[in-house]
């Protein structure tokens, strides 16, 4: 099975776009909607692209579920330590409150960009990446063997919160999201566990997200997930047209807000 090799060049370095004359600290681009918008617009202008992309890390959803995230000026937000000791602790967590915390700032930032008629793509983290900020991978892997039904319940909880997040974004005027789950990869999970994860967790989640957008939006899908689904016979790629909506992999958005030079993933 082909595993897409993520390169450092694939990662956007927002620190390079931070203007030292700004009267606030770098870490505030992660915590304040207006400063997030300023950074996103600055990045768009300096890199001569036609859209803004927010937020700038993969820790927002996890933090909103209770993860302990450290936000600094010299590094990107990262998990300080896992809050949950057992799977039951994850199940006991409150669902995301979309009116408070950093996730509310992301939603507001997206709405501000939409109000300015600026194309915005919101980065949405996948369930495994979110879960790794809440509980040790060792505990999760043990759960696969000892309590598979509990693992299913945990992923359902995470997925339900992701779907609700996308519903809120959609109501705010967002029509494009970028979906990635960096830790759901072949080197980390191995072929058997990855196959099961893609089929039982990612596939139903992506179907739910597609149902939310219908023909009015686009999900830009991480190549790792794309090639994983294809490799295990759960999907296939077809060339896209400029009017197509849905799941886009290896696609881009041009200045006319149409999709080009890419392919769409059909989930079988």
PLM regions and their residue ranges:
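N-terminal basic, low-complexity leaders that serve as flexible interaction/assembly modules and, when applicable
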Residues: 1-73, 192-220, 227-268
């Amino acid at each position: 099975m082909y595993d897409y090799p993520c390169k450092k060049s694939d990662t956007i370095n927002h620190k390079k776009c931070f203007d030292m004359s700004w009267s606030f600290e770098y870490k505030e681009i992660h915590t304040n909607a207006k400063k997030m918008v300023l950074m996103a617009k600055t990045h768009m202008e300096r890199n001569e692209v036609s859209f803004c992309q927010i937020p700038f890390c993969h820790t927002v959803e996890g933090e909103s579920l209770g993860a302990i995230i450290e936000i600094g000026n010299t590094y990107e937000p990262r998990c300080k330590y896992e809050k949950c000791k057992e799977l039951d602790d994850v199940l006991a967590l409150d669902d995301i409150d979309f009116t408070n915390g950093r996730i509310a700032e992301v939603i507001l930032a997206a709405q501000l960009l939409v109000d300015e008629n600026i194309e915005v793509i919101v980065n949405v983290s996948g369930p495994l990446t979110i879960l790794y900020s809440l509980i040790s991978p060792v505990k999760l892997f043990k759960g696969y063997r000892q309590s598979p039904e509990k693992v299913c319940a945990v992923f359902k909880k995470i997925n339900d919160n992701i779907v609700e997040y996308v519903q809120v974004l959609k109501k705010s005027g967002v029509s494009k999201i970028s979906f990635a789950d960096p830790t759901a990869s072949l080197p980390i999970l191995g072929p058997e566990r990855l196959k099961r994860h893609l089929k039982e967790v990612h596939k139903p989640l992506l179907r739910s997200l597609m149902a939310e957008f219908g023909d009015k939006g686009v999900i830009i899908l991480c190549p790792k997930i794309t090639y994983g689904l294809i490799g295990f016979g759960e999907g296939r790629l077809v060339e896209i047209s400029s009017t197509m909506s849905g799941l886009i992999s290896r696609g881009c958005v041009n200045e006319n807000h149409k999709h080009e030079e890419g392919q769409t993933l059909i989930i079988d």
